Amino acid sequence: MNVVILGCGRTGARLALELSSKGHGVTLIERNPDSLRRLGKTDGFNIVIGNGLDIDVIERAKVAEADAFFAVTRGDNTNIMAAQIVQRMNKTAKVCVKVADPERAKAYRDMGMFCINASSLLAGLCRDWLLNEPYETIDKYNVLSKELEI
C-alpha cells in the first residue's frame, strides 16, 4: 500500500515507522526538515519538504496515486483543509484526519472523513481499563466527547 502522511511529529513519525516496517510505501510531507530526525534515518521514506496545503507539494507527494492519506499535524485547520484537497484529488484514497477539537471532529465525520480525536480515544480506553470493561471499536471512543458545562 502507498501511504502519504502530512506531519512528521510524534504521531506522523510513529505511523510512518509502523507502516514502513510492514512493507508499505510511505511518503512524508513536512515543513520543518528538523522534524525528520524522529524517524532516525530517512532511508526507505519518500520525503517532500513543504507546506501540506500547497497543491504543488501535495502533487509532488503523489497523493493522486496513494491508497491512504493521513493528516496528523498539530493544526486542526491544516489537517482538515489538506484532507479536503486530497479527497478532491483522489476519490479512492482512505483519508484519516487527526482533530483535537471534538466538535470539529463530529462535523468533519459527517462530511465523510475518518477523524481521530486523541483525547476521546484515550479517555475511553482509560475508562474501560479502569472498570475492567471490554475495549470498544475506535468509532465508539471517537464520539465520547461530551463537554462539561461550567
Predicted regions: what they are:
Residues 1-150:
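Cytosolic regulatory regions of ion transport systems
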